[in-house]
Every structure is written in C-alpha cells, then in structure tokens.
Amino acid sequence: MLNKLSAEFFGTFWLVFGGCGSAILAAAFPELGIGFLGVALAFGLTVLTMAYAVGGISGGHFNPAVSLGLTVAGRLPAKDLIPYWVAQVLGAIAAAAILYVIASGKDGFSAGGLASNGYGELSPGGYSMMAGLLIEIILTAFFIIIILGSTSSLAPAGFAPIAIGFGLTLIHLVSIPVTNTWVNPARSTGVALFADTAALSQLWLFWVAPLVGAVIGAIIWKGLLGRD
C-alpha cells in the first residue's frame, strides 16, 4: 500500500508542479508566454508522463475525483479511497508550497491567484458560480468516462495515458476561461492555500463539483457504456 500511496503523492506533485507551474511561471512571460494552450498542454503532459511512469503501481489517479469515480465503477477498493485522497492532497500541497517559494524569488512577486480556481470575481472570464458548477460537473464526468473507457479490456493496450492526457488538455482548453479548471480537488486545494485571494472561501465547490461529476461519469460508464 505504501508504494501505491507514494506513487499517488509524487504523481499529484508532478501534476501540480508542472501544470500550475506552467501557469504561474511561464503563461504570461513577456513575449514568449505559453498562454492558455501551453498551460492546457502542460496539465495533459503531466498526467500522460506520470501515468506511464507510476500508473502500473497505483493506477495513476492523481486526483480525488478520479479515485472516487473508479471506486464507484468497482475499479478501486473502497478501503483505499481515503488513503488515496490524503496522498493526493499532500502531494498537491507540497508542490504548491515549492512553487510559491520559487515564484517569490522574483522581484515584485505577488501571490495573486497563484493559479487557483474560482468563480465570480475569481473566474478568469467573470463566470458565475452556476456556470462553474455546471461546466466542472460535465467535464469531470466525461474525464471519468475517458479514463474508464481507455483503461477497459476493450481498449487498445498501452494507449490509455495518451487518451487521458489529451482528454485533460481538452478539458483545460474549454474551462480555463470559466473556472481556471477545477476537475481535480487536490490541485485546487494545494494552490488555494497559498493564493492571496478568497480562493479558500470557494474551496468547497472545488470539491463538490468534481466529485459529483465523477459519480455521474462512473454511473454512465457502468450502466450505459461499460462492457468490461
């Protein structure tokens, strides 16, 4: 079990460090900034690379919503759910803390949103709570369907990390303007702790929407689509 939890810790660490790091350090870099597309690709690449690296150990969840979805679908024992969540959140917090230290090394640094999520005045595009809730539930549900489908016995072997990574990239392309992309409660928690905004006051929704979406996605796959 320790090996699985370590894999989830380091996998989630890499997701936050690489994905949020790209947003904090590189997205708006003068003239050469990577923008929304670069950040979206970074998140997808973190999952793709670590799924290949440690997916065989823990399943490569790196996300409490994914772990819940796989539990509902019968892919993860219920007794492992909370330990997975703890490892994922700790990995996210560790990565966010190190990113904060690195970013604060620049003159004139201001924590600001620190790649945190939000709705209303914390939404990159000024979207409402209802808009954020709806898009995150839908996107998380489809993310779970992608994961369950690409890792099923019916899917071509060896390609699941690619499908999952590109799926997460697409999710970010759609939702960065709306919420800065939640779908992962651990990622949301890690950066919210260090953001100089009201992100913590909205953190409850960063958990509720992805977890609801995960359950919906698992039910859809298991009841309507799943054949494995």
Swiss-Prot record:
Site annotation Involved in tetramerization or stability of the tetramer: residues: 20
Transmembrane segments: 1-21, 23-43, 82-102, 129-149, 154-174, 205-225
Keyword annotations: Cell inner membrane, Cell membrane, Membrane, Repeat, Transmembrane, Transmembrane helix, Transport
Residue window of motif NPA 1: 63-65
Gene3D superfamilies the record matches: Glycerol uptake facilitator protein
This protein's record includes keyword Cell inner membrane: yes
Subunit structure: Homotetramer.
Cited function: Channel that permits osmotically driven movement of water in both directions. It is involved in the osmoregulation and in the maintenance of cell turgor during volume expansion in rapidly growing cells. It mediates rapid entry or exit of water in response to abrupt changes in osmolarity.
Protein name, per record: Aquaporin Z
